[in-house]
């Protein structure tokens, strides 16, 4: 196994949260498909499940946005000359994930998987600031999600655009 996940639960309500094994499976698939090999380098990711207050504070501090958000990605910046397998940290807000799943009429597990994958791709350097970047990232997210047996996470948006 090339992946170690440090799962931190900082949410008061833990009912219905994905297990460490589920996060491991989703992130492992994202890393393998992005690298196009199951033999990607050894990697460590911290996933912290938080409530709205912590998400709000972090989103305001690091992105200047005065509200909680679904997922924040903090890539690890390795100091020069040091070899560490740390990819970075994902902060996922339980309440936002649950609200979005209901609003978007998605199965909760699928939305958790999607945000873990989305955040992992951000840690790998993907972004969606331009249409071209968004198309590349969303295409890879969809491919990964479908390989895991989930629907295209952007199907509702694509249907609206058509």
Curated annotation (Swiss-Prot):
Domain of life of the native organism: Bacteria
Record GO biological process: rRNA processing
Record flagged with keyword Hydrolase: yes
EC number(s) from the headed UniProt entry: 3.1.-.-
InterPro entries, per the entry: MetalPrtase_cat_dom_sf_prd, YbeY, YbeY_CS
Cofactor or coenzyme needed: Zn(2+)
One Pfam family from the record: YbeY
Cofactor note: Binds 1 zinc ion.
Annotated positions binding Zn(2+): 118, 122, 128
Keyword entries, A-Z: Cytoplasm, Endonuclease, Hydrolase, Metal-binding, Nuclease, Ribosome biogenesis, rRNA processing, Zinc
Family, as annotated: Belongs to the endoribonuclease YbeY family.
Summary of the function given for this chain in its UniProt record: Single strand-specific metallo-endoribonuclease involved in late-stage 70S ribosome quality control and in maturation of the 3' terminus of the 16S rRNA.
NCBIfam families, sorted: rRNA maturation RNase YbeY
Protein name: Endoribonuclease YbeY
Species the sequence originates in: Glaesserella parasuis serovar 5 (strain SH0165)
């Amino acid at each position: 196994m090339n992946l170690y996940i440090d799962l931190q639960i900082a949410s008061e309500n833990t009912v219905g949260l994905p297990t460490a094994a589920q996060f491991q499976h989703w992130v492992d698939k994202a890393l393998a498909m992005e690298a196009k090999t199951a033999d990607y380098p050894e990697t460590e990711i911290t996933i912290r499940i938080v409530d709205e207050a912590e998400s709000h504070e972090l989103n305001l501090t690091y992105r200047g946005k005065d509200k909680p958000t679904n997922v924040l990605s903090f890539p690890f910046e390795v100091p020069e000359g040091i070899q560490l397998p740390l990819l970075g940290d994902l902060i996922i807000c339980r309440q936002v994930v649950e609200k979005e799943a209901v609003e978007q009429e998605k199965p909760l597990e699928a939305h958790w998987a999607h945000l873990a994958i989305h955040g992992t791709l951000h840690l790998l350097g993907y972004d969606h600031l331009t249409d071209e970047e968004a198309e590349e990232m969303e295409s890879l997210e969809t491919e990964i999600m479908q390989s895991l047996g989930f629907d295209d996470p952007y199907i509702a948006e694509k249907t609206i655009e058509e």
